[in-house]
Amino acid sequence: MTVDIKTTLVTIPNQNLQIAGYLAEPVAVGQYPVVIVIQEIFGVNSHIRDVTERVAKEGYVAIAPAIYQRQAPGFEEGYTPEGIEAGRKLKDQTSSAEILSDLEATIAYAQTLPNVKPEEVGLIGFCFGGWIVYLGASLPTVKATASFYGAGIPHWAPGTAEPPITYTDKIQGTLYAFFGLEDTSIPMADTEQIEQALTKYQVNHKIFRYPGADHGFFCDQRASYNAEAAADAWQKVKQLFQTELK
């Protein structure tokens, strides 16, 4: 059973930067855990807004910050070759330090909201956002992370930064990672490396690999959408947040 929600555009301060955010929250008065929703390379588009609303309907305050605020304020693209090209260019202009800073600022903003339980923080991200939330899972405030098909976690970072896998020893919460076995951007060796690192550092985790599913399988606006895999993954996300965020 889902709850009634309301949505609004918000501004998240981070020093001199004003980050645009999409906020979805239950209408009923109360206190709720918060889940930060992290975009793909395409910005906070209609799919990410929809996911933010779906999370809120499960009884969470959900916020999607604009990760490209520094590079391209208001950037939003669809799933076209042009959108992919534009999104990838912006991804390469980011920095891990700035991303972490903006994520921390979003969490800090959420913790000031009167209907948020400040100790109950979760993350969910897709595509580039899956990469970002693995990095973000290293923040001490984060209790639960759902990372969807984040390419490059073991070996890629913008500029000269270390890849997210090098932060695994700092992860204190529970992490679920979701991959499609048909996703050529994430070789099986990468997912095995992620699993080995999580096991080595005794991170509470589960890795889910979906046969027949490709990159972007959770997004119903993509040609690669896989309804069966998406439905199963959503149930696991709900289970994760229900268990870890009280």
From Swiss-Prot:
Keyword annotations for this protein? Answer: Hydrolase
* UniProt keyword Transferase present: no
Record family assignment? Belongs to the dienelactone hydrolase family.
Q: Where is the active site?
A: 127, 183, 215
- Which InterPro entries does this chain map to? AB_hydrolase_fold, Dienelactn_hydro, Dienelactone_hydrolase-like
User: Which SUPFAM superfamilies would you find in this protein's record?
Assistant: alpha/beta-Hydrolases (SSF53474)
Q: What is this protein called?
A: Putative carboxymethylenebutenolidase
Q: Keyword Hydrolase: yes or no?
A: yes
GO molecular function (one) = carboxymethylenebutenolidase activity
**EC number(s)?**
3.1.1.45
